[in-house]
Amino acid sequence: MKDCILITGGAGFIGSAISHLLHAEDNRTIVAIDNLHPQVHPKQRRPDDLHQDVELIVADICEPETWSRFMQEWRPSLVIHLAAETGTGQSLSEASRHTHVNVTGTARMLDAFAAAQHVPQRIVLTSSRAVYGEGVWQRPDGDLFQPGQRSKSMLDDAQWDFPNAVALPFCADITPPNPTSVYGATKLAQEHIINAWALSFGADVAILRLQNVYGAGQSLDNPYTGIVSLFSRLAKSGLSIPLYEDGLMRRDFVYISDVARAVLAASKEQAAVGRVYDIGFGSASTIKDLADEVARHYGAPAPHVCGKYRNGDVRHAGCDVAASLALGWKPEVTMAEGVARLCDWIDVRLSEGAV
């Protein structure tokens, strides 16, 4: 049996970026398991962005046979668990699909390790800010409360915010998880399942709750993820970017290179063990700010409020990254710089006919 670094979902956006950092800093063989789902990989082939030395196994993590074949050859000392269905809105209409992949797929992996009597030294899970739902809000008198999910009647009446309150940044040490989407619920389940298993078997665990990840290498075909790439393609076509709600909902956009560095740190640093860290830029921007930045880059018409909303979306999401500094990590790429990098990459991809 051979040692390796296992990256589940390793042919995706984040996995491909991590593969290059790991290859540069670690001499272990890197094995990626990915089913190359057509929603993410419409061409059904190995992505160009995945490091050429990564051994790619095209298989479904939900199938026991995938793991029996894998464990016949490999004994991973490090597991980076990325594989997941990630559509927040889509998870409400395809709940069984998201639950099957995110929960059952995780359990299948752990069952395979247990059956082979193998315990990885460390498991790094990329979780999501979706586990917080709307998070914690504060009233003018200082009272804190968790508002829960915005109701359909609120959204239909264009009552976007909770009245007389402001949303506070998410912080893993103090913000209780309270998911408002099926996707968020499955990511929280992943955290609980992996923590319970690792505590029983003696594996180290590090969990990163990622904010909105974007950047060069992001899928330009998946309509359910990647708002920055979607905006970029619209603006490049000379179209006005439509803004849902009033365009003033906030998100914390973190560039892919910063996320890849955070995952690498979580795989190595002792400070990561047994902790949950929030990974974002540390300041939230409105969707309108983002759309304005993209429109300026392409000289596109000003974005417009379209009056629509998306089920499952939270109003505001941002995080406090102070705790994550313990990993020796901090975000570096500003939104303006990140948007410019992404748009330049999209221009090259389109000129090459790659999308």
Q: Where are each of the predicted segments found?
A:
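C-terminal substrate-binding subdomain of Rossmann-fold SDR/epimerase-dehydratase oxidoreductases
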Residues: 59, 165, 235-355
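A conserved pocket-lining segment of Rossmann-fold NAD(P)-dependent short-chain dehydrogenase/reductase
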Residues: 91, 162-181, 205, 209-219, ...
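Structural element of the ATP-grasp superfamily
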Residues: 109, 194, 231, 323-324
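Short, solvent-exposed loop/helix junctions and linker helices
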Residues: 8, 100-103, 183-184, 221, ...
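N-terminal Rossmann-like NAD(P)+-binding domain of SDR-like oxidoreductases, especially those catalyzing
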Residues: 1-211
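Hydrophobic alpha-helix immediately C-terminal to the catalytic Tyr-X-X-X-Lys motif of short-chain
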Residues: 189, 193, 197, 227, ...
